[in-house]
Each structure stands twice: as C-alpha cells, then as structure tokens.
C-alpha cells in the first residue's frame, strides 16, 4: 500500500515522504496517525503543502537578506563602553548578549544572541566585526566599537 508519512517514523520514512509499505504495517501507521493513504486528494494536498513551505522558505531568505542590508548599510557601529586597564585590555569581557542588547538600544534592531557567531567574548578595546547568522545562506557582520569608560 502506498502511504504518505505525516510524521517522522524512525527507520521507515520522514514527514511528507511517499513510500510503498506492506498493508499490515501501513494500516498500523494510519491508525497511529503517523501516515495516511496516498490517494489523489492526499497527493494534491501534499503538493500544496510543499509549495507553501517553499514559498515560506523563500520569504524568510528575502527577509534575512533585507535585514543584512539594514545591518551593513551605512556606518552602523554599535558603540560600547567598558572599564579597561592601561594596556587596552578590558576588566571582564563583552559577550554576545551585551552586543545584542546594545544593538536593540541604539538602533532598535532585535537579534537573538545565539545567532551571533562570537567564538569567545571580546576582551580588548577597538573595532571588532561580529558575524551574525541570519539564515542558513545569509551571514551579516555587525561592527562593534569598544571604548574606555
């Protein structure tokens, strides 16, 4: 029997996949609401869902590209002040959470701290480019300037 998986089934198939399975196992999956029979109506519904998902993915990509342009347009620099010693090293460090908060405070742009690809906290003064992963295919750079208090 041909079925369409409505959920991921370990070892058998992923959501949205169409497979030929033995009748007994197919009936079991249908009763568990993990699959449905692959008839013409279900196939057209699946195609519609895939088109909607593709459209949504394209919209998210466009949105990420626009946000990248906003972040990198002009001279957007996130200004931060921290206590520092005489050699230019900070007492403490600047984390992605602090950068995210300052970006929102100064420019009104909200970015999740987990999207910032800061390998380690910033411990020196000066300019630093912080990469931000907005989408699987889109990465922007935020310029951060750390000065002494």
From Swiss-Prot:
GO CC terms in record: ribonucleoprotein complex; ribosome
BP GO annotations: translation
Gene Ontology molecular function terms on file: rRNA binding; structural constituent of ribosome
Q: Is Kinase there in the keyword field?
A: no
The record's keywords, sorted A to Z, are:
Ribonucleoprotein, Ribosomal protein, RNA-binding, rRNA-binding
Task: Give the HAMAP family listed for this entry.
Answer: Ribosomal_bL9
Q: What does this protein do?
A: Binds to the 23S rRNA.
Q: What NCBIfam families does the database record attribute to this sequence? A: L9
What's the family?
Belongs to the bacterial ribosomal protein bL9 family.
- Protein name (Swiss-Prot/TrEMBL): Large ribosomal subunit protein bL9
Q: What is the species listed in this Swiss-Prot or TrEMBL entry?
A: Ligilactobacillus salivarius (strain UCC118)
Kindly list the organism's lineage: Bacteria, Bacillati, Bacillota, Bacilli, Lactobacillales
């Amino acid at each position: 029997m041909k079925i369409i998986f409505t959920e991921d089934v370990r070892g058998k198939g992923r959501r949205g996949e169409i497979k030929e399975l033995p009748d007994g196992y197919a009936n079991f999956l249908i009763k568990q609401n993990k699959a449905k029979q692959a008839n013409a109506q279900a196939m057209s519904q699946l195609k519609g869902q895939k088109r909607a998902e593709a459209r949504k993915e394209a919209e998210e990509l466009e949105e990420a590209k626009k946000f990248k342009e906003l972040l990198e347009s002009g001279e957007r620099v996130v200004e931060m002040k921290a206590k520092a010693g005489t050699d230019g090293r900070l007492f403490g460090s600047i984390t992605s959470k602090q950068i995210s908060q300052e970006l929102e405070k100064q420019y009104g742009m909200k970015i999740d701290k987990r999207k910032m690809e800061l390998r380690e906290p910033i411990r020196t003064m000066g300019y630093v480019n912080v990469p931000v992963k907005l989408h699987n295919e889109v990465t922007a750079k935020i310029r951060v300037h750390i000065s002494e208090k």
